[in-house]
Amino acid sequence: MAGGRRGGRAKRRKVCYFTSNGITHIDYKDVDLLRKFVSERGKILPRRVTGTNAKYQRKLTIAIKRARQMALLPYVTGE
């Protein structure tokens, strides 16, 4: 079966969190929002995992990196 699905459920399309909630500006000081898009190890989650648009993924990446520089978010977490 070339190109077909191999059983299981059909994947649900992820919706962008920012466009669905009407958020236009991503603030680097909003740490609670930024933590939703960072893994437990401190890495920025990719678009295919979070479902964000390319436009907001770029803004999100800049905000997370800025928050890391200001010591609001850690660069890495764990042992």
Curated annotation (Swiss-Prot):
The keyword rRNA-binding applies. Keywords: Ribonucleoprotein, Ribosomal protein, RNA-binding, rRNA-binding. One of its GO terms (molecular function) is structural constituent of ribosome. GO terms for cellular component: cytosolic small ribosomal subunit. The keyword Glycoprotein does not apply. PROSITE patterns: RIBOSOMAL_S18. GO terms for biological process: translation. Pfam families: Ribosomal_S18. Belongs to the bacterial ribosomal protein bS18 family. Binds as a heterodimer with protein bS6 to the central domain of the 16S rRNA, where it helps stabilize the platform of the 30S subunit. Part of the 30S ribosomal subunit. Forms a tight heterodimer with protein bS6. This is Small ribosomal subunit protein bS18. The lineage of its organism: Bacteria, Bacillati, Bacillota, Bacilli, Bacillales.
